[in-house]
A protein has these predicted regions:
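Residues forming the flavin
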Residues: 1-294
Length: 294
């Protein structure tokens, strides 16, 4: 709305989402202690849902009692990295998850019936602090991927995409695929290596054939990868003390309490809906106990 309002409070819960980079910057600028944490970067991969059904159900794939099949895959690579699928959406679609103007970040969802033509899932590679290139809490590996995706996407909010076959062959995609992308804003065919950190792209290329052994057709040449997926968890953690309150950078142990309670995914203490809810309960109890008579 553009309306700014100041509300004074002795205590406040900071439960921002894991995409709230502007909030992270404000909190860091106020002197609150923050640290890097591992997170993941990758793409959304789409397959024909019928092919996934056949791979999972075999001859029973057409049985009316069976719904759209799902999967959960992971592989440990020789260099110590891992690649895995996350938030698999049977009969779903790839959606825009931008949280700022002009942003290009993707996520996935399924409607209640799960009856869409495609299956999709995040295909991710773990990223650790050693990959950041800086010890600054907002070092920005995910930001670099975000900016590259915005550049490669072309038109406003279009997402970069590539077929699995072209990605593994090391060539840019220039036309459509046998699997039609569901991203509503449209895709710009390209080479996704231009949008991803090199080690992420290399890990995906190594992982795809291995994951295909676990789910036949996973590395099908006509499958589509749409970028970038960086929203599986927060890249930072706001440091909390034993009372679950934020700490001011460099403050002594006997410093006055801050009254600020970082909570949930954005604060770096959860990695999904259920774990965020559990952390919310912890923070609510800590906040309530602060008002109990001493």
């Amino acid at each position: 709305t553009g309306v700014l309002e100041r509300v004074d409070a002795r205590r406040a819960v900071l439960a921002c989402g894991h995409s709230a980079r502007d909030t992270f910057a404000v909190v860091h600028g106020a002197g609150v202690a923050m640290e890097q944490k591992p997170f993941s970067v990758g793409v959304r991969i789409e397959h024909d849902q019928g092919a996934v059904n056949r791979a999972q159900y075999g001859d029973a794939a057409a049985h009316p009692a069976l719904g759209a099949a799902d999967y959960k895959l992971a592989v440990h690579l020789p260099d110590g990295r891992s690649a895995y699928t996350f938030c698999m959406c049977p009969g779903g679609e790839v959606v825009c998850a931008a949280s700022e103007e002009g942003g290009v970040v993707v996520n996935g969802m399924s409607r209640f019936a799960r009856d869409g033509a495609n299956a999709n899932a995040a295909l991710l590679v773990g990223v650790g602090p050693e990959d950041f290139g800086s010890d600054h809490p907002l070092a920005g590996v995910e930001r670099a991927a975000f900016e590259a995706a915005r550049s490669a996407g072309g038109e406003a909010y279009q997402a970069p995409a590539q077929t699995v076959g072209d990605f593994l062959a090391g060539r840019a995609s220039a036309a459509g695929a046998s699997v039609r992308p569901t991203y509503a804003r449209g895709v710009a065919w390209c080479d996704l290596r231009a949008c991803l950190p090199g080690f992420v792209a290399d890990a995906l290329a190594e992982a795809l054939p291995l994951l295909d052994r676990r789910l036949r057709g996973f590395a099908d040449a006509g499958a589509v990868m749409t970028g970038v997926e960086t929203r599986s968890s927060s890249p930072v953690r706001i440091v909390r003390d034993d009372a679950l309150q934020a700490r001011v950078e460099g403050a002594p142990d006997d410093a006055p309490e801050s009254g600020l309670y970082p909570c949930g995914e954005g604060a770096g203490y959860a990695g999904g809906i259920m774990s965020a809810a559990c952390d919310g309960l912890r923070v609510a109890r800590a906040l309530a106990s602060a008002f109990e008579p001493r």
